[in-house]
Amino acid sequence: ALLVILKTDALATAASAFLRGLNAQNPAQAAPTDLSWLGFSYIAFRLMHVLRDLHNGKRANMNLREFVTYVVFAPSLLAGPIDRAERFAKDLRAPYALNISVLGEAGTRLVIGAFKKFVLADALSLMALNAFNAAQTQSPLWMWLLVYAYAFRIFFDFAGYTDMAIGAGRLLGIKLPENFNNPYLKPNLTQFWNSWHITLAQWFRAYWFNPLTRWLRGTRANSVPLMVFIGQISTMLLIGLWHGVTLNFVAWGAWHGVGLFIHNRWADFARGRESLAKYERAFRIGGVILTFHFVALGWVFFALPEFNLSLRVLARLFGVNV
């Protein structure tokens, strides 16, 4: 409930106004940022992971100190990766010595991450898509350049932070899981989501998609295509809403949910067809290009604050002025 309040501007503003009233402050000055809680999204995921496993009879073998350290582990607090409690505790208990090898490994990861985030991402942010340049740009070519810049900016920013988190964790004796694996080089959307924010996708697969599809098998909605559609669209909608309770994040989640379902149906159709096998290399190259552009178009909803502006940008990309 607290996560929903913090992610919803209207609810956060109402809660802030209520608390201001209790403290004899002016409720009219309430803002959603009053209740910002640094890293709470990832704290919530860790808590839900432990509670869900406990509900399923899988109690994490951790003492209180290990549990608190896991929940608020600083390097991965802001943007992940989302570690598993048992794996984290195993690293925490293992003998650890800070030696030259560890320093070299961690230092390399920190430097690479800093370069991605503070050099590449910051440079790309100067021309990446935003509300201001989206409203001003009329040329389809320039609009595509803005979208491409945003796609690579968000990757280098997020992957750079992850590299630094993994490097910092290594210095403390914790081997955080990898979170990115060349996502823009994947030939389909399913492989993209197995390579982008890997631990988030694994979390939703384990605690939402898999339980939901198991439940659907016992209902009337037990046809495979329908189960896949409901599972994928609901999972991606939840991931979108987790980023923020806005229409744009709903649209972004729906965009990816529909894309995943289309790929699932295509993969099922193409499986075992010898007539398509001889074009495997062409399909792979074409798939990389198509998948990247599908993801890049989806970033339009992610980058902009207004749904109508996002639709206008998508139209302008294809030479339609609305």
Spell out what each predicted region is:
Residues A1-V322:
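Membrane-embedded transmembrane alpha-helical bundles that form the catalytic cores
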